[in-house]
Amino acid sequence: MAGKGEGPAIGIDLGTTYSCVGVWQHDRVEIIANDQGNRTTPSYVGFTDSERLIGDAAKNQVAMNPINTVFDAKRLIGRRFSDASVQSDMKLWPFKVIPGPGDKPMIVVNYKGEEKQFSAEEISSMVLIKMKEIAEAFLGTTVKNAVVTVPAYSNDSQRQATKDAGVISGLNVMRIINEPTAAAIAYGLDKKATSVGEKNVLIFDLGGGTFDVSLLTIEEGIFEVKATAGDTHLGGEDFDNRMVNHFVQEFKRKNKKDITGNPRALRRLRTACERAKRTLSSTAQTTIEIDSLYEGIDFYSTITRARFEELNMDLFRKCMEPVEKCLRDAKMDKSTVHDVVLVGGSTRIPKVQQLLQDFFNGKELCKSINPDEAVAYGAAVQAAILSGEGNEKVQDLLLLDVTPLSLGLETAGGVMTVLIPRNTTIPTKKEQVFSTYSDNQPGVLIQVYEGERTRTRDNNLLGKFELSGIPPAPRGVPQITVCFDIDANGTLNVSAEDKTTGQKNKITITNDKGRLSKEEIEKMVQEAEKYKSEDEEHKKKVEAKNALENYAYNMRNTIKDEKIASKLSADDRTKIEDAIEQAIQWLDGNQLAEAEEFEDKMKELESLCNPIIAKMYQGAGGDMDDEGPAPSGGGAGPKIEEVD
């Protein structure tokens, strides 16, 4: 068990568009379906005037409620508002994003009639809560521990922010691992029994919103990431968009009307396009039918696989570039790649498979693992290893992750001096001795950067600190040892020490990059609890309302039944009918009443109806038992007694 008998640990693939959860059970990984029966859950959170929706329920209502339905939180997490990628993404989102304190992007929605602001961590934590609940419903126990995946080139603050999201959701994130590493584990488990010697594996992960290519070597259960490349803005949604644009033009031609100004029409068209795209992976042609798409006009059309491929051909070809870059970075020829693994739903597209297969000179691609589930599968295996759940089958897997970007510091003239080159296996530690730039310099400023450019101004500043108190000396004399230390989770510690005086200073690179403070996390954890209890309240309310509705309609049907009606006095019958009418009218006017009010109404109605019905049954001498339903035993009776 997870260290202290804390129940099973789960693996979560927290995706840009969809998420997936798995658990190690009975010596194998079980990918868990949600309450809708789907093995992947949309990474969507919707806010309405009465409730909060997560997953399928949120995505299903996005057409009616676009500005209060949040998705793509993964594109915001661990980034600053002023970040160029955030600025360009914002243009595409229907929901509002504003700069919060410390340049942190905040998502603004209307919830229960009030304006609320959420950070990306909070939205992601809501998706994580959903995944946790899916696992708990399946396992029948509470789940505390999880392994969560991030893209291979997520930087430090994105990893850290993902961990924070876990904390807010009430999960202990045992480890953050790279998605391709997770896919390789899933794959490695299948293959480990037979493999001898080193294997080179290329992971081709084309998801809903992002595209990642990674090259790994696997030897005797040891995974090493050699190189990563990709495009953070290429995925299934782009293919959907091409189809959407194609049909928007068609609608314009046919009807002389432009639907682009109508978000609901666009959303309905996009949903239909996503469905059509999936269908085209297995058939050559499909139809799109949308009733009353815009201004009452129905839209019917067909699209062939060939047309779909033509609309996206440039994008499909673009998918091959990172594959070449990855091989170049790893200094490897494509002929030395043993296996090519497909991950992500978009790798089901036949054209993508064909282009990739052609690139590797006709090599068979590995498709044995469901591409949507491979990452969660690997995360679940890793969770089992870390919690000591797994058996010997998995215990001897060892994970070596890498740094996605080079790490270094700024030296005189704004030059980037790299201490840890990218694709270095972590955990790792590097030391280097530096000195002062001018005579009698009293201190040095250590500025830590990540990136591949030679000038620091083109790279990303992670943090800085000062080492002061250096005794006066000519330039180049003082010896300052700088140490970069990355742990298994990819968290970076940088320290500097003056050899002569023993003066020391250090920084842990997590905090000043839009990280949440302890207090903020605490607050968010409490809020998450609050929202959860509100969701529970809402559920109670709906149940009480349904119980009352059921009872009223059942009763109405009961007294319409000839056998029963004939045994009621006209007076009693009118009494019941009036009471039911009143109850139904009250229901129509009070859909948002509190659970107690529904329950009180129910009691009122019961106390009037039940004695009359009971009297009738006694009068009938009990020969009615097996005939018309006795409403108190009907849809709603016993359910209610338990409540009060």
From Swiss-Prot:
Start and end residues of each stretch annotated as Disordered: 618-644
Leader peptide range in chain numbering: none
GO cellular component terms attached to this protein's record: cytoplasm
GO molecular function, one term: protein folding chaperone
GO biological process, one term: protein refolding
InterPro entries linked: ATPase_NBD, Heat_shock_70_CS, HSP70_C_sf, HSP70_peptide-bd_sf, Hsp_70_fam
Name the record gives this protein: Heat shock cognate 70 kDa protein 2
Upper taxonomic lineage: Eukaryota, Viridiplantae, Streptophyta, Embryophyta, Tracheophyta
Originating gene: HSC-2
